[in-house]
Amino acid sequence: MDIISTTFDQINTHIKFTNQKKIEFQNHIEKEWEIITQLESNEQFTVYMSKKLKGPNFTNNRFGLCTVKKIKSQYFNENEILNHIKLRDNKYVLKYYGCGKDNNQDVYIYLEFIEYSIPISKVKLIPNDSSIDNFNNVSNTIIELVTCKLVESLNCIHKDNKIVHGNIKGENILLVNDESEYGFSVKFINFSLNIGYEDSIHLDMFNLGCVLIQMLGCDCTKDENIDFLFSKIPNHLVEKFKKVISQLLSKNINNQILTDIISNKITTSLPKYSTLIGEPNDGLIYIGIQNNSDGLILPLFNQPICKKTFTYGVYYLSLSSFHRQLNVGVIPESIHTLELASFNQTILPGVIPTSVRTLKLPSYNKTLTQGSIPKGVRTLLLSSFNQPLTTDIIPKTVTILKLQSFNQPIEWGALPCSLVELSLASYKQPLQWGVIPYYISTLELPLASAPFSEGSIPSGVSKLIQQGEIQQINKPIKINNENNQNYMSCSQNEFDSKLTLILNSKITRESLFFGLKYLELSTFNQSFETLPIPETVEYLKLPMYNQPLTPKLLPSGIKFLILPSFNHPIRGESIPPSVIHLVFNKLFSVIESIPSSVKYLDLGDEYYVYPGHLLHSVLSFRSGLKFRVTDPIPYSQSLTNLNLYNFNIELLKNGISSNVTSLTLGSNFTNIESLSNLPSSVTNLSFGITTLNEKAISDITKYVKSTVTTITVNNEQIRKKIN
């Protein structure tokens, strides 16, 4: 039995909890969330890593991620949320964003998502017996660092928030990888509920002592005798840490202990790395890690590393002082997060294992070659790096790249298109089109950077950071096309959040990126045979394009096709059967084939359409045709939306299909009387007249049928005036 849980059951015999704050639940709408992965699950609740897709995004995570805890209604205890509210401003717990309920009354708690963290239960430092003398100072320093963090954070929760955790064990304390002085901070999770503050504060301190012993590799689960626990305190610890742990385990523990520990200035007595113990005696230090351990933090370690130094199974490795040469194969392939704060030796291809996903090299400033950074790395920190970058040095798996000291010209393609967050805090070179990848959403540049040229900042950027100040960008950068430049617009997800890039030269195959969905080329008039449009494109607008279309030239999944200048015969399957929105503003050539998928058709001012020529599938038709009184109005049997913006003459009886519900006529409509010929199906009518006065309104009142519920004249809705 776990002594921590057992002791909790023995001590916690009184329950006191009072809180008068009202809980406000929002509606939890499932379709507004995407579940990325399940983190934990039991009979009472399930915890997910989730992403907010729609509605207000209350997270501060760069990807919109947060932790969502779903609690079944029958197991919900409001004290859990009240605790979160009370701890809302405490930096040692997960940030609380809010709570919600679904239609089944299940409760959802929205919390901060920590990308890089390790439970303390998986962090153990166990030196081999043969090297324990050489390892003493390293071990003591690590214990000192972690102890100070734990004592400080727990004291803050007790003193500032008057809350007891009540469930302290290694699994409920996270070491969070961050950019603080020592590279980590502490977060407490999974607070127990219904715990009285005064009755149970000593329980937290006792359990903290057990956690410290367990972190040293000693077993606290087989004996509940406190004297036995004292015997578990490692002999090689310095006396002051033995005293700290002894105080925490004492039967006479009280609220003053944490204050006494902090007042003894343990946290301020930490030696700096430069003054810590030097290198051990000759020979290598072998650090054994338990099979179920993930993390290893060695702030003083600076010994040569061989293949036996670190055993396979280490997930997180932090060597703050290490600055020796690394050889291929000495870093275990199990490493996912690697931090080498002082390292500045040349990295040869293969030195960093392909398992690494987060790589932090804040002091590195040597030349990088292809393969120095392995494929698979997603977060790359090179704070001091200021060497030339060429194509393929930064792998295309990297999504977060921090180059705070970098100030070299960036060639096109040197930054991978996978990036979503980029820091160039010292960059003062001119930014050319296409240098900043198009999926970037967060960009950091110096305040005194070179002036931005058109298209140098992708319109997908939503956060621009300069000198630490964040500028929110809500709209795409306005395009100035006076010089007839080509520009390309694209979007990763939706058409209305497009990214805009300027192309100052001829468009090439390399200009069109994989994953492109929105594509607009303002002056493009080349053959698609020389420049295939990516199959991912769904929206294609080519204002100047006037080349013949043949089958299979256009992407098979395209939905919106806008060709305002196109004037060639349309035959066979030249228009893909996926198109639903089709625009030809200048077309007057033969239309032999339009796919039945088309719902919106715009044929501009030139094309003459005879009755029956429109497809039965067309629901919306727009044309600027200038009509004579004898000209029949084109329609299809299914047409519901008809826009004839140049129609300014008499409406003949039966001239408008009885299926049309929305009708737009010309801006100078002259025959108000003929409006009486509108079919009863029309409910929405728009047109323009020379003068809108009381007489005109009276005439419209006289001739427009009461079935028309919305009338807009000269862009002014007048239905209410008529009524």
Curated annotation (Swiss-Prot):
Stretches forming FNIP repeats: 301-342, 343-384, 385-426, 524-565, 566-606, 647-690
Coiled-coil positions: none
Ranges for domain Protein kinase: 33-276
Keywords from the named record: Repeat
A GO term for molecular function: ATP binding
One Pfam family cited in the UniProt record for this chain: FNIP
SS bond partners: none
Entry domain remark: The protein kinase domain is predicted to be catalytically inactive.
PANTHER family linked: FNIP REPEAT-CONTAINING PROTEIN, FNIP REPEAT-CONTAINING PROTEIN-RELATED
Entry's family note: Belongs to the protein kinase superfamily. STE Ser/Thr protein kinase family.
Protein's UniProt name: Probable inactive serine/threonine-protein kinase fnkD
Encoding gene, per UniProt annotation: fnkD-1
